[in-house]
């Protein structure tokens, strides 16, 4: 069976939103998904953009990007997706890619689709001269950890992720 990675289109948004919910269910955090299809569409295709796009990206670059893989047996159905955005290293003075979501539907796992999506983003990094490609993974997701190790990715064990949200964010801001 042949799988092809391609940039997402507006027609993919509904299925991508469904896969975001599927991913959240897998990660035991479905109650945290409040984003709508419309918000996803706007971030990907609706004109939400960085006001000052980096020189090595198209002018008016979108705030969010996505690549998908079609189900070769079911036209119009998606097998997997990668949602990503640009980040920047102040130490290296270069842009990179931050992978927000990587998801392959259960019936397609173990066939190399996750690696194919990761490889496509790595190709974008190298073609554009970006110097890093990074993401987070839950410590219990052994299947994903195995994939990441197999491609040569290394964990950044010395870092701790912090987050401010909701009332704590508002309280601190005020």
PLM segments and residue spans:
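Conserved N-terminal entry element of GNAT/NAT acetyltransferase domains
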Residues: 1-14, 25, 169-174
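A conserved beta-turn-beta hairpin within the catalytic core of GNAT-like acetyltransferases
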Residues: 77, 88-99, 109, 156
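Conserved active-site alpha-helix within GNAT-family acetyltransferase domains
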Residues: 115, 127, 139-158, 164, ...
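Conserved beta-strand in the GNAT
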Residues: 68, 76-86, 103
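Conserved acetyl-CoA-binding loop-helix of GNAT-fold acetyltransferases
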Residues: 104, 110-123, 146, 150
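Conserved GNAT-fold acetyl-CoA-binding loop/helix
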Residues: 17-53
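Hydrophobic adenine-recognition pocket in adenosine-nucleotide-binding enzymes
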Residues: 8, 102-104, 137
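Conserved GNAT acetyl-CoA-binding A-motif
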Residues: 126-136
